[in-house]
Amino acid sequence: MYNTDYKKYNVDIFHPAHFEDIQEESADCGPNVQEVRQFLESNRLEYALQSVLLNPPFGHSEQELKNRAVLLVAEVIHAFRQTDIEESVHKLSNENGDILMKYIYKAMQLCSDSATCLSLLLWHSQLVSKFGQGSIVRVLSNRQRL
């Protein structure tokens, strides 16, 4: 006779939309807030930007942690003068540019302050001018969300 054991599996549970990856949740997930604040207080904005992009909380299940990280990034990029944005964007790698673009889109969703939204749009335009529209496509199509 034929073996029909394979018919006992429910294949619907293997659908990618229902897949939940097991992530290791660690205490050091997200940017180091004290280090970023020290850089901001000493007006070393480029170091603050690099520090805030080092450890994004992708894959973390706690949304409050992700929101705090997004608001911290918004605070850092709002501290830059408009004339310094282009120079700072040109120093970013492709990976950091994509990470920053993810933060910007999430910050646009969370922030309601018009001055912060203006700085977010300025950064967005500079990122698009350096990395092209592919940056937008990579952010929107990536499964790692903030």
From Swiss-Prot:
Keywords: Actin-binding, Cytoplasm, Cytoskeleton. Component of the Arp2/3 complex composed of ARP2, ARP3, ARPC1B/p41-ARC, ARPC2/p34-ARC, ARPC3/p21-ARC, ARPC4/p20-ARC and ARPC5/p16-ARC. Functions as a component of the Arp2/3 complex which is involved in regulation of actin polymerization and together with an activating nucleation-promoting factor (NPF) mediates the formation of branched actin networks. Belongs to the ARPC5 family. GO terms for cellular component: Arp2/3 protein complex; cytoplasm. This is Probable actin-related protein 2/3 complex subunit 5. It holds the Pfam family P16-Arc. Gene3D superfamilies: Actin-related protein 2/3 complex subunit 5.
